Amino acid sequence: MIRQAHASLDIISRRKKAEKIARLLQIDRFPGPIRLLEIGCGSGVIAHYFAVHPSFHCDVSAVDVLDQRVEKDNYHFEVVQGSQLPFDEASFDVVISNHVIEHVGDGAQQLTHLSEIRRVLKPLGSGYLAVPNRWMLTEPHYQLPFLSWLPTNLRSPYLRISGKGTHYDCRPLSACAFEEIFRAGGICTTNIGGTPFSDLLYK
């Protein structure tokens, strides 16, 4: 399946998201310097925010399968293929995966994504992972009501009938499914946001 680019390139909204992540992870309480990785950096605004913030002292790396960045300075960037990360084990104090896991592929590829986060994260490190809830009333990528509620084989036909695409290339998860895949990946998590019909936030 050919996967579409879904990155938000709006600087203002991405900066607000970066501020939210910093607040939820309490980055200002981390002893510096902090090695931080953003997976699926899209616009680059979040990576840039952490790289230049005077209070955080972050050494930032970022990866994505495409280079769509509008903010390119003050951090290291690499284009990657798939979910494998080009970093050594226990390399980072913080790993951010913001609305990425629903784009990496099927359940096995999603598990690889989580396993790679665990591999590169230091034993006492922290991660931030957000994913659209499958049960959101309006699917956020295509703005169609109940799109992700449908069985997998009906999502692409609905997309075509709506005129908004030809195939549905995302795999959002319910809270239960996501917690199951976390357990399979051997990752300890805390739910830090989300309701039955909103984004799921974990650290």
Predicted regions and their residues:
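S-adenosyl-L-methionine-dependent methyltransferase catalytic module, highlighting the catalytic core
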Residues: G105-I117, S126-K203
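Conserved N-terminal segment of class I S-adenosyl-L-methionine
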Residues: M1-Q84, D88, V94-N98, L114
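A structural micro-motif
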Residues: C58, Y75, G125, I187-C188
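A short SAM/SAH-binding and catalytic strip from SAM-dependent methyltransferases
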Residues: I96-A108
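Active-site micro-motifs of SAM-dependent methyltransferase domains
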Residues: Q84, E102, M136
